[in-house]
Regions:
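Active-site catalytic microenvironments in core metabolic enzymes, especially phosphate/sugar-handling
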Residues: 1-263
Length: 263
């Protein structure tokens, strides 16, 4: 039985997450792991968000959180100055830690896309894009429905599953049975979905030329947005970490919200 009064080091959380979604299996451009703070830092209160925005960081400071855990890195591009308004700098000067699981979690078993699959009530049949063949890891998943569905009906299911205000829909094949899914900015996976013979692709941040490719090949595409397809990270992390470390407090930030509204 775990001791609820025992202290917790950031290293313990890091090591657990490294087994869940190995930090070594990520895109070369990415920046994952502990980005602010040290492994020896004591943590008791952990704030979870998609992004370490200024409102999220200020909540962490104001409410006494020790660690901000996010999907997106707080330091992605090199810092050219140390402005106190920069979230990473703000965390550091207030002695807070920040840890990110980005593309390592996107391609992990039970990562973002597997959560997408589960929320739609589907089962994954394979990886859409095996980016890391030695570890058999990659981006996107392929699923087959028990019965065919129309593009509009699938779009409505997607809206409900990912709590989307709106989705963008390109109706290609009208009888959809084989589906590819990928989280976040995933329009580049549409061609992989086409090559796998999928009837539909569900993702986010689809670019204009990617819509045109989909139109030309006749595949249905549903753009559920970057935030809705990845904010699902937060609830999953709270669940697994609370179960593993009951001596700590895990809270989803009230400020982990989409940065824009539809008008």
């Amino acid at each position: 039985m775990e001791n609820h009064s025992s202290s917790l080091n950031l290293k313990e959380i890091y090591d657990f997450l490294d087994k869940l979604a190995p930090f070594s299996i990520c895109d070369s451009y990415d920046n994952v792991g502990i980005l602010v703070g040290e492994k020896t830092h004591k943590v008791k209160k952990i704030l979870i968000a998609l992004d370490a925005t200024v409102p999220v960081v200020e909540q962490a400071i104001d409410e006494g959180f020790d660690l901000v855990l996010c999907h997106h890195p707080v330091i992605f591009h090199p810092l050219k100055n140390l402005s106190p308004n920069n979230p990473a700098v703000k965390l550091s000067i207030n002695n807070k830690c920040m840890l990110a699981l980005h593309t390592n979690f996107d391609c992990a078993d039970y990562g973002t896309t597997d959560i997408m699959v589960s929320l739609l009530g589907l089962k994954s049949e394979g990886i859409l894009n095996v980016e890391f063949p030695q570890q058999n890891k990659g981006y996107g998943r392929i699923c087959t429905l028990s019965e065919s569905i129309s593009p509009l009906s699938l779009a409505e299911k997607v809206k409900q599953a990912y709590n989307c205000q709106k989705v963008r829909l390109l109706s290609g094949k009208t009888d959809i049975k084989k589906i590819a899914l990928a989280s976040g900015g995933s329009g580049s996976e549409i061609k992989n979905a086409i090559n796998h013979g999928c009837d539909a692709f569900i993702g986010g941040d689809i670019k204009h030329d990617q819509w045109i490719d989909a139109l030309n090949y006749g595949i249905t595409v549903i753009d559920a947005g970057h935030f809705p397809t990845e904010n699902i990270f937060c609830a999953y992390m709270k669940k697994v970490l609370s179960e593993k470390f009951p001596q700590a407090e895990f809270v989803i930030s009230k400020n982990s919200v989409e940065p824009f509204i539809f008008v």
